[in-house]
Amino acid sequence: MSILPIIKGEYKKDYNLKHLTWFKVGGNAEIFFKPFDSADLKSFLIQNNKKLPITTFGSGSNIIIRDGGIEGVVIKLGKNFNNIEFLDNHLIVGSSCLNYNLAKFCQANAISGFEFLVGIPGTIGGGVVMNAGAYGSAFQDIIVQIEALDFLGNFLTFTNKEIGFKYRGNNLPKDLILLKAIFKANKGDSQNILLKMNKINTTRSSTQPIKERTGGSTFKNPVGCKSWELIDKAGLRGYRIGGASMSELHCNFMINNGNATAKDLEDLGNFVRQKVFEDSGVELNWEIKRIGKYV
């Protein structure tokens, strides 16, 4: 391990990440770093100069941390990166702000177009990276620009076009840490916005296992079909490996039934991919990220 950069924030060594993920599984971070602010993060990156490997971490909602843990430095942006500012008909939002909190802010301030965020777990930063979407809307529809640091500490901006949004992804460089996202704010009716959000919440609670230890949609939808339909057709609704299973309620959701390991979850996902391909000839691609050392 190289000498760690001098910082204002906080380092924790051999830090268990399990409690930070929605699945509640996984190993330790060799070094866990919460920067004090963007200047602190920039200073760390400049001093590090890519010597130590870096992994960024959001709310842990769509990720499997493998049981062998993560080498190098895991960076998690905290409360100093979750601000929401309404300025000149734009919203300037910190990357660690929860999607749900931005949706509630917009409802309270009669800003329309953000209702779908109430049904998407995770942070704004993760939503941009994944081009997260639901109920007919996605991040690509509302983003104007993002601000970021690369792993050398250079400050960069990208417009919506430069981000290169695609289905559940983008064409941004991989060595970026998102700081802020800027959105166009369109005025709407607060009561109508609330009605839309309530409808989304009702639909989610009746069709998704939101009270379980899950990571959201496991696989991206292939062109022209739904992953859950292919999984169901292959007879895998409720299928179980160890402490992990495909949800009975929505079979594109994996669940930790209480004693699953990260290996159980990843093995289950790969088994489902194999069986769906054998049954339908369609290759499912992971939507949930898997990071760390597989053991």
From Swiss-Prot:
Pathway: Cell wall biogenesis; peptidoglycan biosynthesis. SUPFAM superfamilies: FAD-binding/transporter-associated domain-like, Uridine diphospho-N-Acetylenolpyruvylglucosamine reductase, MurB, C-terminal domain. Disulfide bonds: none annotated. One of its GO terms (cellular component) is cytosol. The active site is at 168, 217 (proton donor), 287. InterPro entries: FAD-bd_PCMH (IPR016166), FAD-bd_PCMH-like_sf (IPR036318), FAD-bd_PCMH_sub1 (IPR016167), FAD-bd_PCMH_sub2 (IPR016169), MurB (IPR003170), MurB_C (IPR011601), MurB_C_sf (IPR036635), Oxid_FAD_bind_N (IPR006094). One of its GO terms (biological process) is regulation of cell shape. Its cofactor is FAD. GO terms for molecular function: FAD binding; UDP-N-acetylmuramate dehydrogenase activity. Pfam families: FAD_binding_4 (PF01565), MurB_C (PF02873). Its main location: cytoplasm. It is found in: Cytoplasm. It is an enzyme of class 1 (oxidoreductase). The keyword Cell wall biogenesis/degradation applies. The keyword Oxidoreductase applies. Belongs to the MurB family. Cell wall formation. HAMAP family: MurB (MF_00037). This is UDP-N-acetylenolpyruvoylglucosamine reductase. It comes from Rickettsia typhi (strain ATCC VR-144 / Wilmington).
